[in-house]
């Protein structure tokens, strides 16, 4: 009797066990996956902060044109897309007129630096005027700006220039590149003294200007990195 009852209960117990097993959740398949980092979108990229505007500065070159160095300086200016004022000597223009034309063609300005670089303060009014006119005869027109050689001027010279309808332009930063102190010395002197509105004096003629060429190639990107814009004076 007991054996018969056990045989009847066994299928029922097995069915109940199977139902209980199916009712237990499968944690391996239903647990949430661990969080993953969201994809980076364009709007989440790190923004590059622009350099703050520090001012406008101006490049000027004296004593050219030079057959050797002026074209090399022009190449550096074109490389960076900047322009300068070249205060030229009339006698040099007569030797290398095509170089002066190239400077103007590529957007640079020419200023009057006299015929052959005398100290104008030692000359009479007549000879000051002669020096300026002789340079302009070689150039073919009257530029708007005059730079007296050595920066030597006084009220008399300034009046002569103004009466001609021209502006006297000196400089505010002089790295003394003409003395060939070393490429990095030229660069560092400019960077130390430069301010908003600075007129930087460099030379493309009058001697070996290889250091000036090399310094210019280093100087322009460093001025920009400090927030300076390189402008062009109206000459």
What are these model-derived regions, one by one?
Residues 37-123, 127, 133-134:
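Active-site beta->alpha N-cap acidic-glycine motif
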Residues 127-132, 183-187, 213-217:
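Charged helix-capping and loop-helix junction motifs
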Residues 82, 108, 166, 227-228:
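Short phosphate-binding/catalytic loops that engage adenosine nucleotides
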Residues 90-93, 117-119, 152, 174-177, ...:
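Short histidine/acidic/glycine/proline-rich micro-motifs that form metal-
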Residues 74, 78-83, 88, 106-109, ...:
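CE4/NodB-like, metal-dependent polysaccharide N-deacetylase domain
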Residues 1-32:
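Secretory targeting and sorting signals
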Residues 144, 152, 157-193, 228-235:
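His/Asp/Glu-enriched short active-site or ligand-binding loop at hydrolase and phosphoryl-transfer sites
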Residues 40, 44-51, 80, 93-94, ...:
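C-terminal domain-boundary segment and adjacent tail
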């Amino acid at each position: 009797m007991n054996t018969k009852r056990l045989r009847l209960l066994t299928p029922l117990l097995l069915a109940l066990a199977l139902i209980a097993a199916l009712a237990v959740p499968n944690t391996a398949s239903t647990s949430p996956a661990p969080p993953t980092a969201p994809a980076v979108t364009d709007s989440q990229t790190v923004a590059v902060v622009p350099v703050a505007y520090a001012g406008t500065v101006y490049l000027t070159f004296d004593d050219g044109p030079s057959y050797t160095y002026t074209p090399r300086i022009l190449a550096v200016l074109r490389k960076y897309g900047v322009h300068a004022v070249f205060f030229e000597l009339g006698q040099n223009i007569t030797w290398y007129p095509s170089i002066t034309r190239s400077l103007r063609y590529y957007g640079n300005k020419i200023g009057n630096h006299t015929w052959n670089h005398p100290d104008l303060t030692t000359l009479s009014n007549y000879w000051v005027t002669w020096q300026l006119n002789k340079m302009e005869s070689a150039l073919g027109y009257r530029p708007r700006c005059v730079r007296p050689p050595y920066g030597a001027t006084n009220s008399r010279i300034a009046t002569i220039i103004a009466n001609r309808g021209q502006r006297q332009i000196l400089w505010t930063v002089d790295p003394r590149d003409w003395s060939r102190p070393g490429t990095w010395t030229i660069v560092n002197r400019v960077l130390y003294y430069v301010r908003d509105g600075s007129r930087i004096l460099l030379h493309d003629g009058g001697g070996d200007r290889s250091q000036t060429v090399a310094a210019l190639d280093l100087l322009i990107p460093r001025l920009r990195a400090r927030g300076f814009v390189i402008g062009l004076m109206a000459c």
